Amino acid sequence: LIGSIISGYAYYHTGRDQYIVRRPEWSDMEYMIRGHFNWNWVNGDQISNMLIHWIDVFNWFTQLKPVNVIAYGSRIRKNIGNVYDNFSMHFEYENGVMLEGMVRRIDGCDNGAGIVIQGEKGSWHSSDFSIRNRNGETIWQYDPEAAKSKFKVHDMYTLEHIMLVDHIRKGTVLNIAETAATSALTAVMARESAYTGKRYTWQQISSSPLNMLPEQMALVNVDLKQFGVPLPGTAFIADD
């Protein structure tokens, strides 16, 4: 109904993450793990943490990989470890397909999450599960009540488990490792583009030696300077 996919718009806007007040008895590592929302080595920052779900949807629809991305981001709150609280990005995919993405975690703003898939003939909207023509007129509308009467199971999480158990019983392989890795790397390349202010390519990120893990994986005190806030336009991360 929508024809060949030419572009998409993905967004995820919500309030701020929880801030964990540090207790005196916590080591640096325990503090970061308990407040994992606020440290990029634990939660991956907002693109990998939130927008990735809609990136995954777009990748599934198109069955394409991104060629490159240019992104930017910043942080309004300063007491949130080393993560940003807003990002914006522009992906170029194979075959000239484009994806615009935005994610924000700031209180007091208008919120919402979803994706629009734009085709040559029309568009699909996750907000109301509708298909619209180029004039914006709805030409198809998902009917949840009709779906309930047609299918015995309609909960997506239950369907996932049914598919998994079905493959186990049949002795067949259910392997989504590549699709999961593709979506994860798509999110990471956008984050790294925003952190550095540089355009990132799929080749760069898929062969990158990037390792964000602490030097010592134990509940001990560490040098927190190694977890500085990324500063675009510089070769290294820097403190606020």
Language-model features, listed with the residues they occupy:
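Predominantly a Rossmann-like dinucleotide-binding segment in NAD(P)-dependent oxidoreductases
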Residues: 1-80, 109, 113-116, 123, ...
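Loop/turn elements at helix/coil->beta-strand transitions in domains of secreted/extracellular proteins
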Residues: 3-5, 95-97, 170
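Short helix/loop capping segments that flank catalytic or ligand/cofactor-binding pockets
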Residues: 19, 101, 126-127
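C-terminal helical cap and adjacent loop that interface with cofactors, partners, or active-site loops
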Residues: 49, 53-66, 70, 86, ...
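Short beta-strand segments that buttress and anchor functional surface loops
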Residues: 71, 91-92, 102-103
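Active-site beta-strand termini and strand-to-loop segments that position acidic
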Residues: 90-96, 118-120
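Phosphate/diphosphate-binding loops
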Residues: 99-101, 107
